[in-house]
From Swiss-Prot:
UniProt EC number: 2.5.1.145
Classification lineage: Bacteria, Pseudomonadati, Pseudomonadota, Alphaproteobacteria, Hyphomicrobiales
Protein name listed in UniProt: Phosphatidylglycerol--prolipoprotein diacylglyceryl transferase
Annotated gene: lgt
Transmembrane stretches, start-end: 23-43, 71-91, 107-127, 133-153, 189-209, 217-237, 247-267
UniProt organism field: Brucella anthropi (strain ATCC 49188 / DSM 6882 / CCUG 24695 / JCM 21032 / LMG 3331 / NBRC 15819 / NCTC 12168 / Alc 37)
Family per similarity comment: Belongs to the Lgt family.
Record NCBIfam families: lgt (TIGR00544)
PANTHER family registered for this protein in UniProt: PHOSPHATIDYLGLYCEROL--PROLIPOPROTEIN DIACYLGLYCERYL TRANSFERASE, PROLIPOPROTEIN DIACYLGLYCERYL TRANSFERASE
């Protein structure tokens, strides 16, 4: 019965070319642009925060805004290398262990946010220690602007018709070109809204109204917690990766497994930030 009802209530997939433009053999994709926009926005926004002295403890930013100019390359390497290695290890290890030459082929798709955040975290730690910057404040500076990039990349996932959701009869379900004959949740857009719009707005309020940058580690903790919760919610609507399927009980996915520790780590980071600030008061 549901199969006969689904076609009448679903939306056609918008025919948007994943390639924005080509210059000879070079093709610029929406997905790649999403990463560039995300990194550049976090760079610009981080510098804006560092110039606003009143936001920081003792009105003293942890670094000069110009320090982020040097960090951009570190961030790009952390995102790309971490994202790719994370995808290989978490989502398709058996394939890549048999086809190691395919590991560097990021242009064929396959990036993990959880791997990307681990790679970026390592880059931030190494950069901060090499420049004498407090690591927790480095985390905060970058985390505050990351949701914008997440939102843009998720929209690019939608344009690419990838990472779509489970079969659904909701009025806004979409027929994806490679998603089979039945309409599905546009779960990429759910993620763009929760991980991008909502999470950025929450962090914006914590930074500019709550003045939480005065508590090193709080904003980073809020970001990690917010992302983890958002991802867990969306995983109930998102189709699990074909090569993994459900890990348990027809509902548990790899995305959930990787996100639960993020929530716990984020809550701990916020608790630690509050506790440390209270001791220093």
């Amino acid at each position: 019965m549901i199969e006969t009802l689904l076609p009448a209530s679903a939306l056609a997939f918008p025919n948007i070319d994943p390639v924005i433009f080509r210059v000879g053999p070079l093709a610029v994709h929406w997905y790649g642009l999403g990463y560039v926009v995300g990194i550049m926005f976090a760079w610009w926004y981080g510098k804006k925060l560092l110039r606003s002295h009143r936001l920081w403890a003792n009105n003293q930013p942890p670094m000069a805004p110009e320090a982020l100019d040097d960090f951009v390359i570190w961030a790009a390497l952390g995102v790309v290398l971490g994202g790719r290695i994370g995808y290989v290890l978490f989502y398709n290890f058996s394939y890549y262990i048999s086809n190691p030459l395919a590991i560097p082929a990021v242009w064929d798709g396959g990036m993990s946010f959880h791997g990307g955040i681990l790679g970026t975290t390592l880059a931030m730690i190494l950069f901060a220690r090499s420049r004498g910057i407090k690591v927790w404040s480095m985390f905060d500076t970058i985390a505050a602007g990351v949701p914008v990039g997440l939102g843009v990349v998720r929209v690019a996932n939608f344009i690419n018709s990838e990472l779509w959701g489970r079969v659904s009869d909701v009025p806004w379900a979409v027929y994806f070109p490679n998603g089979g004959p039945l309409p599905r949740h546009p779960s990429q857009l759910y993620e763009a809204f929760l991980e991008g719009v909502v999470l950025f707005f929450v962090l914006f309020l914590l930074v500019w109204v709550g003045r939480k940058l005065k508590k090193p580690g709080f904003i980073a903790g809020a970001f990690v917690t917010g992302y983890g919760l958002s991802r867990i919610v969306v995983e109930f609507f998102r189709e699990p990766d074909a090569q993994l399927g459900y890990l348990f009980g027809g509902w548990l996915t790899m995305g959930m497994v990787l996100s639960v520790p993020m929530v716990l780590i984020g809550l701990w980071a916020m608790w630690r930030a509050n506790r440390t600030a209270a001791k220093d008061a």
